[in-house]
Amino acid sequence: CPITTHLPLKLVSKQITKKKIKEKIVIVNDFYRKYLRYKPRIAVTGLNPHCESVLKFNEDKKIISPVIKSLKNKINVKGPFPADTIFLKNNRKKFDVIIGMYHDQVLAPIKTIFEYDAINITIGLPFLRVTPDHGPNEKMIGKNISNPISLIRSLEFLDKR
């Protein structure tokens, strides 16, 4: 679950704000409680490699950490964690959801681990929106080569709600 979506990497750090991080954590928590009926264990990645900040770029300490600290009494949230290790099996099994700072920080590992067996849930809307976890692949249109697993998982998820 990324804080920012489809942005060039050079623009990401300017879009990482305390407000956006807090909103995303709260929305994810509310979604789990409403639709899945339990309090999720949420991990948040840092922005910089290994969550190390140099003096000029200090997003992990100045922006991300204070938000997590402010929510810890209300929401089961921890971090920031290095994005290169949070998706390792022993780390990710400790959490129900991992919130990252940008699209590829989260989606690249998810698609590598789960391939087509993942779904996209758009949260924060007044209705439930679920789609297959892949973008439109126009090169596959009409060739009968697409994999339907993600569509099937999306329908199964909706059927349980």
Name each model feature, range by range.
Residues 2-80:
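Glycine-rich phosphate/diphosphate-binding loop of Rossmann-like nucleotide-binding domains
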Residues 1-26, 137-161:
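Short, glycine-/small-residue-rich phosphate/pyrophosphate-handling segment
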Residues 67-161:
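Glycine-rich phosphate/nucleotide-binding loop
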